[in-house]
Amino acid sequence: MSVVRENGVIVAIDGPSGAGKSSLTKLLAKRLGYIHIDTGAMFRAVALSAQRAGIASDDDAGLAELCRGLDITFARDGEACRVLANGEDVSREIRTEEIGLLTSTVSARQPVRQALLEMQRKMGAKGGVILEGRDIGTVVFPDAEVKFFLSASAEERGRRRYLELAARGESATLEETIAKVVQRDRQDEGREHAPLKQAEDAVPIDSTSLTIEEVLELMERTVKERLAQGDKG
């Protein structure tokens, strides 16, 4: 039986904050000609919208109503991919440290997870997509044909995040940034609904001492091998 869907396979990339999922997903999608669905950005857009609307992170009824009226889409802008919330470009606003921490809390609420789960499944059902997040291979698409779990040490992830913030002109110390990475890990791993964990059939990749190109080549080779198996099926 073929393992390839109408437009190709579904590739799930999970892992903790700062592991390099977004950068690698964008590059891999470009190489394969696949669509990149940034689920983390979707949750961040909900968190930003909730903050703006004055909805508390534990207000399930308010969050459910917010999600019903929220349209999250992605638009290509040259090499970049913009995130739109009800037509507004929020690509920059959702990437602050404050929204990042709020996202970990908001994304643990069941109404938010359910609303975005349905949205993500519709986006990726026909294959030819790469989704990255924290529970893609375990909850969103447990039947994804290719799964990766990308990780790196907290120190390395904090260092990468610190450099990102510095490049954007945001003030933070390396120690503070690493501490926030550890805090985010604790929140993501300990939440009740869909905690961060590696799928049993995922390919684990520790990128602490690997270059982006080395990780990218490993991922591309794995996907192409799976596609070849599907062609034979």
UniProtKB/Swiss-Prot annotation:
Compositionally biased intervals (Basic and acidic residues): 183-200
Top-rank EC class of the record's enzyme: transferase
Keyword annotations: ATP-binding, Cytoplasm, Kinase, Nucleotide-binding, Transferase
Keyword Cytoplasm assigned: yes
Chain spans, region Disordered: 183-203
Locations listed in the record: Cytoplasm
Annotated ATP binding sites: G15, P16, S17, G18, A19, G20, K21, S22, S23
Domain of life of the source: Bacteria
Reaction(s) catalysed by this chain's protein: CMP + ATP = CDP + ADP; dCMP + ATP = dCDP + ADP
Presence of keyword Kinase: yes
UniProt protein name: Cytidylate kinase
Gene field: cmk
